[in-house]
């Protein structure tokens, strides 16, 4: 009886172990969209938000994803809808140069290989991502070259000079 109970417990452990391991996504099809901050006057950092809709040929759903941007890793959150994911990060305005940012997405297996390669100081570019999204950031607008206060003061001084000159010319 004890052997049967231990065999049942072993079978339960094996089944729970199999159910926790996620299946790899085969031939991912993505529909990406993204947003980047364009106005540096009203914000302190440049924000990048990438949203994707993911479908796999083998119909894997709700898989854990991780994103890598320029050597920094970020967790990818799942949306309420099936197959919707989002990742976001922020940079200082000076660090967020205009150009294209490559966001590489990894599943759990390839992400663990990426982290292992980083720990061992190996080349991480040889680890293929599940898919890649290119984010085009046009840069941030820092406001006009001359602030409106300085411009208003300069115009006021010019008007004062013209009025004073006209008064002096009339009295002469």
From Swiss-Prot:
Placement of covalent cross-link Glycyl lysine isopeptide (Lys-Gly) (interchain with G-Cter in ubiquitin): 72
Location within or outside the cell: Endoplasmic reticulum membrane
Keywords assigned: Disulfide bond, Endoplasmic reticulum, Isopeptide bond, Membrane, Signal, Transmembrane, Transmembrane helix, Ubl conjugation
InterPro entries named in the record: TRAP-delta
Annotated GO CC locations: endomembrane system; endoplasmic reticulum membrane
Protein topology in the membrane: Single-pass type I membrane protein
Lumenal side: 25-143
Family: Belongs to the TRAP-delta family.
Quaternary assembly: Heterotetramer of TRAP-alpha, TRAP-beta, TRAP-delta and TRAP-gamma.
PANTHER family in alphabetical order: TRANSLOCON-ASSOCIATED PROTEIN SUBUNIT DELTA, TRANSLOCON-ASSOCIATED PROTEIN, DELTA SUBUNIT
Protein name: Translocon-associated protein subunit delta
């Amino acid at each position: 009886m004890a052997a049967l109970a231990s065999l049942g417990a072993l079978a339960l452990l094996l089944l729970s172990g199999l159910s926790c391991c996620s299946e790899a996504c085969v031939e991912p099809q993505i529909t990406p969209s993204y947003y980047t901050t364009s106005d540096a006057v009203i914000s302190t950092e440049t924000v990048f938000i990438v949203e994707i809709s993911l479908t796999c040929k083998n119909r894997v759903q709700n898989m854990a994803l991780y994103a890598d941007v320029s050597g920094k890793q970020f967790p990818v959150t799942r949306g309420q809808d099936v197959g919707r994911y989002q990742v976001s990060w922020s940079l200082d305005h000076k660090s967020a140069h205009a150009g294209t940012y490559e966001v590489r997405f990894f599943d759990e297996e390839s992400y663990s290989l990426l982290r292992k390669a980083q720990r061992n100081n190996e080349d991480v570019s040889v680890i293929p991502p599940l898919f890649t999204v290119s984010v085009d950031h046009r840069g941030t607008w820092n406001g006009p070259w001359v602030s409106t206060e300085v411009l208003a003061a300069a115009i006021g001084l010019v008007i004062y000079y013209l009025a004073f000159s006209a008064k002096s010319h009339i009295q002469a």
